[in-house]
Each structure stands twice: as structure tokens, then as C-alpha cells.
Amino acid sequence: MSATPIPRTLALMIYGDLDISILDELPPGRQKIRTDVVDSRYHKRLYEFVKKQIAAGQQAYIVCPLVEAGESDLLPAEEYAEQLANGAFKGINLGVLHGKMNSKSKERVMAGFVSGHIKILVATTVVEVGVDVPNASVMIIENAERFGLSQLHQLRGRVGRGKAQSYCVLVSDSKSETARERLQIMKKYSDGFKIADEDLKQRGPGDFFGNRQHGLPELKIADMLSNTEMLALCRECADNIFCLLYTSPSPRDYAAS
């Protein structure tokens, strides 16, 4: 069971290695998450928006790609949280969560966020899965170009779990055409299978007989994306052949059919 299909999973489904059931409806009472892409010049407006959401009784996530400051110019979670606590969100209960914290500290922070005592949670991708806080309505992802489509889709799924309108804002100053295209895919689509399809186009399915989960397959002629209908027909024919082989006692009977 996967809430976030990855390219290789999608490829396996196309080639018939997996049977699937698709649940493509939102649970009752939930609204579609509004997603936007902005650059860092919008930070001040974002902070004001978060304050309004908190004043309305909601909570927010702010996700950073790093735990601590390094050689890059990316925003580290700990330093960023300190800046926000002493600046834009002074006086608002703010928590920090990342993978380098011990279990008790992480549990204490999450308990505070779940209870509503912590209004803003600055975190790394540790919140990507297994976090369910219906009262959280805002997800801000800093340096969003550093994340893949599957991760972005998972992170966005942390909000939109309650009845209030939820928002996901992808912040990026990247000039990379590939990165910008990836973020626009997130803005355009909310369906995980459509996002996986676009991810498949960008990254490829990987090896069919190896262990690479991305990259172009070593096929000389066939293209799984443009030949999807042909693949489905081939799968149906192969299934029919296997059924005949199992039900016919000899190859001669099979040939006659």
C-alpha cells in the first residue's frame, strides 16, 4: 500500500508485476490543498499569513532540508527556528523537530504539537510520514528544489487532514529549469498517480532486472511512456496465454486453440 507512488512502482504496475486498486477520492469533509510556488522575497508575507492562520486556531509546519548549518546556503532547521522564535514569530510557541534529536525529545515536541500547545513546528523530513495533526493547515517547504516529487507530495500530505482549508507553499530561489518544472508539477497536480507519472517522465523507471530505482531503462526501441496502450495489450495477451497453458493438457491442444 502506497500513498505516494514512486516512478519504479508505477513502472512495475504498467508492466504487470503488481495489481492495483486506486483510491482517488478525498475522505469526507476534506478540501483540496492549495499549493503555490514563491521565492524568498515572499517570506514576510508568508509569516503574516501564518500568523493569521494561528490566530484562527490553526497550526503550521515549516520544513527545512538541513538540521544544522553547513557549507551550503540552505536554511538549517535549528538556526532558522531560532531566528523565527526571536523575530517574526516572537511570542508564539514554536518547536523544532529533526532526526538528530533523541527519542524522548522528539516525542515531547510532537506531543506538544499534537496537543496544540506548539503552534509552529520547524522540522526536517522526519515529518514526512506517520504524522497526523488535523489542526495543521499550513505547510511551508523551504529550499523546495532540494526535494523530489515523492517527498514533496508526502510533506504536503501532512496538512489537509482536517475540515479547514489547507495550504502548501513551496519556497525556492532556484534558477534550474528542471527544479522549477518539478515545483510547477506540484502546484498543478494533487493526484499522487499523476505526480508519479510526471516523476517517471523526469527520472525514468530504473532497471527492470536490476536494483536501480530511477534512470532510463536499457531499451533500444520500446518506450513505456508512449507505448502504454501496447503494454496493456501485451499484458492481456500474456495472461491469456498463461491461462491456456494451465488449462490445456498438452501443447498440441494449446496450438489448436
Q: Where do the protein language model's features map onto the residues?
A:
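Flexible beta-alpha connector loops of hexameric P-loop NTPases
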Residues: 32-41, 71, 144-145
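Inter-lobe coupling/hinge region of RecA-like P-loop helicase motors
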Residues: 30-38, 64-66, 92-105
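Glycine/Thr-rich phosphate-binding loops of Rossmann-like dinucleotide-binding domains
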Residues: 8-9, 70-71, 131, 149
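Post-DEXD/H (motif II) to motif III coupling segment of the RecA-like Helicase ATP-binding lobe
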Residues: 1-34, 41-51
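Glycine- and acidic-residue-enriched helix-capping/strand-helix junction motifs
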Residues: 70-80
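A short beta-strand-to-loop transition that corresponds to the Sensor-1 phosphate-sensing loop
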Residues: 1-5, 16-17, 65-66, 124-126, ...
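C-terminal helicase module of SF1/SF2 nucleic-acid helicases/translocases
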Residues: 43-59, 78, 82-86, 90-248, ...
